[in-house]
């Protein structure tokens, strides 16, 4: 009997406690209007979210009750963007609510992991955000622009191959915008794409995993206490996958691979964000938690791509259904192309950053359809706050939904629900700032989204590329749907795509050249003699491995292989050795690669070329002081063993560690032990502290002979240790020959440029762009594509100088047009070789196209 009484007493106590709690909760916010059920329970919020239309319910509630509405027993929603600075201040004190606790990924072994965007602890947030904030500044993000260019190139190629010329077969353009956003962030974070674009599908189920994560946390965020029971519970996770497990698995795999490569002294790309994350933690082990790189990387994968894709889909959909705005944007882009040389294939940030209508379209897309579309919840601090003339006591959860703030009619006008980019034009600075500050898409105050600049960069580069190269038409726009599960997802953006013709050249207008940067080559009275040796070896190249886009008739290019004899008085060096005569004795993996990808015709050892020379020159293989490899690929290394042991081998940074031991000691090596056997190998360093280190144009350089006559240049990217060379061949006036190695394989990658626009009489008038290079470097082969693109840009600066003659190792247009070994090329400028050969590649392309026709 006593036991029964105790049970009743306990039950009554629990009921009284719950009643007291409900009454207290109801009473403290009793003056705030809202639906009755919402004042008593959070189940009203749960149901709204479960429908996928919570934003519409929120809108209707505010239309009924005003700018401040009670959405739950302790949750208040505000719709007035004028109070954004109050709820989301720059100072600490307004922590995020428990809604964000549900967004921490969970594993049984490590528990819930905080990240920059989901942590509620403001001190921890500062610890996580401060070390990496500078990485997301626009200054740093722009340095990563070549990585976005790499992904743009792949997207364009996939669109061309899969959808252009398919008789207007519709495809899901929304999916492909998402693939681009994810592969761009993958490249920025890991230096490699996830593979969405190449495969045309959701790789590793990442996209579905993120969507599943969002649908879970959207509901749990309304009743966060239940998340601890149902999702973040080590017992429950024995029977179901933890929240965010799939994304964490991808993150952990990338991090473990990178850490392993570092431990094995393998070269990793130190420029991507993962390497920077690891470096930051390693340099501050006492103040930064060991798990921080994992948290930072998780944020990039989870929040850094889907949200960008969301804005891309919004902007594309509205442009396609409102063709007038599409025409206006395309007109602005065409004007930028015509007036400022904006590239069609890879629009530069400098070329697009300040285009007014493009900027207006991006802002309107950010405003109209924010990627996250539930209230951004904050906890009112001690002392309470007053918003919309209503007092909110401490502990109240308050938030503004970006969907409501961004469509506020008092701020954005009566047409705030409509797409109208022109609302952003012709505003005073004060009005423009007011509107921008009223958009809550990226958050506000001290918790503003770190990835904002990355998203803007990607969007402003993507749309010019698409609209200048393609005509896109939406199919069945009524099928375009949206679902709000915290993440405001769109579905059904189907379209057809056609390639736009290249712009016609105006033969009456000569493009004005921009002034290239100064090269600042150190003065010297010393020169060298340069002789181009045509080894006689021909290689059949697949263009898609070396440049994009593909052109009709250029399915195969037969290219020569050049090397160079450099003479400084009685000192002679060779820059490259072409292909060795007995190339089938190379390592088996290289022989197999050669047989599958190319055809070698008439290979010849350079030592034999020198020793069989019947001219009066008299320089033999025994006279060669050093062999300099531009890099260690088979078509440049030749056979050093045919030179005496006294001949030194000079290589670029990192070659020794990555290429030796050679074959057969290392079965996987691409070089032979005999390449270095019995001879000294000297590895060049471009460190500023090294003797002879200098700067030429944008290149780090090393004065080889020490007299200013011959420089080796750090031309990184194509392969480990890739270098170029610059030789001074005359003085008073100075003139130079640049030897580019494999920095690129076709002059169309270098020309035209804004420094060197195409002259009117250069050849085929149907070829594109007088100030935009015909081709872009392909990402297929370079070991460091970012560095390779940067090297090409650096060479363009040299190429624009009338005193520099650029010679690429495989430039077929030079054959029969310039002097070859045993003659010198020192008088190239007097013979006007630069003017006569610079644009021959246009005729080369024209002939290929005509041959295809």
UniProtKB/Swiss-Prot annotation:
UniProt key word Phosphoprotein:
no
Question: Where does the protein end up?
Answer: Endoplasmic reticulum membrane
| SUPFAM superfamilies, A to Z | Cytochrome P450, Metallo-hydrolase/oxidoreductase
**Entry membrane topology:** Single-pass membrane protein
Q: Which residues cross the membrane?
A: 7-29
Cofactor needs: heme
Which pathway? Secondary metabolite biosynthesis; terpenoid biosynthesis
> Protein name, please?
Cytochrome P450 monooxygenase mpaDE'
- The source organism is Penicillium brevicompactum
